[in-house]
Amino acid sequence: MPTDNAIDVDLLVIGAGPTGLFATYYAGFRGFRVAVVDSLPELGGQITAMYPEKQILDVAGFPSVKGRDLVEGLVAQAATADPTYLLDRTATTLHEDDDAENGAVVVGLDDGTEVRAKAVLITAGIGKFSPRPLPAGDGWLGRGLEFFVPSFAPYAGKDVVIVGGGDSAFDWALHLEPVARSVTLVHRRDGFRAHQRTVEAVQASSVQIVTRAEVSAIRGNGVVESIEITVDGESTERPAQAIVAALGFVADLGPLQQWGLDVEKRHLVVDSSMRTNLARVFAAGDITEYPGKVRLIAVGFGEAATAVNNAAVVIDPSAHVFPGHSSEGS
């Protein structure tokens, strides 16, 4: 039975990243009462937490948009739905509410709050994520070593070393190059996982790329002052006042894995209507898996609309999946 402090809504969105925020807006567009829960203290998901300054190049209508600006626009758009935000809280349990008229599910949060919803939409991205540590970085976090770059200003005039070969490493190298005194990118392999266009831009810049290498030691008096780079067994020391470890993340779906959802390689299997295998539970965005899946923000927006429209007939059996075009006059 739900407790007295249960929140009653039509749709509960789990995850407040770009896909979740657009789903929130769209739920309001369909006239639904919506609540949004996220384990992070701020809206915007990975963009806010990891790369608010990054220029995003694959969102329709924007040749380029800074991460924080995209989030601000999505938050403003979602505000039209008058959502209830439940931030810095984790969804821990889910069960059907047999006593609810026409059916509902109850989601329990880690602070004791329960949300009773006619449908649930999971837009949790990669789930809870924690950065992979830099082996030589023990004890240096916050003293010159960081995992994220929320602002470029602290790197002005510094010798910066970025460790990694993925999109984050190359994006940060490209953006810090005009700000820092020098930027060195260290990667253990010759090949890179980053987008080829970004790799080529970094290669054409003043960034020094060192491959088949690792940061084997960090030195300094209380703060980072230099690093040791080992290449093919040969070590050299170079000045560094800032290190960014962009080695990827360890993702964990957390309590979602205990809900009976069909999980495939940390992703939720959905059908073409974005339904999961559980009644009244839908999913959209990077967390989903289906044949031909492409993990892009732009794709998440479309999946959000698909999920909300199909959830509409679950929330209100008299509703239609297709609501009509928003551009049509009344």
Swiss-Prot record:
Self-association and partners: Homodimer.
Positions bound to FAD: 19, 38, 46, 51, 91, 129, 286, 327
Keywords: FAD, Flavoprotein, NADP, Oxidoreductase
Protein family: Belongs to the ferredoxin--NADP reductase type 2 family.
GO MF: ferredoxin-NADP+ reductase activity; flavin adenine dinucleotide binding; NADP binding
Bound cofactor: record note: Binds 1 FAD per subunit.
Group of enzyme by EC: oxidoreductase
Pfam family, one: Pyr_redox_2
Catalytic activities: 2 reduced [2Fe-2S]-[ferredoxin] + NADP(+) + H(+) = 2 oxidized [2Fe-2S]-[ferredoxin] + NADPH
EC number(s) on file: 1.18.1.2
PANTHER family cross-referenced by the UniProt entry: THIOREDOXIN REDUCTASE 1-RELATED-RELATED
Annotated InterPro entries: FAD/NAD-bd_sf (IPR036188), FAD/NAD-binding_dom (IPR023753), Fd--NADP_Rdtase_type_2 (IPR022890), Ferredoxin-NADP_redctase_2 (IPR050097)
Protein name: Ferredoxin--NADP reductase
Cofactor annotation: FAD
Domain of life: Bacteria
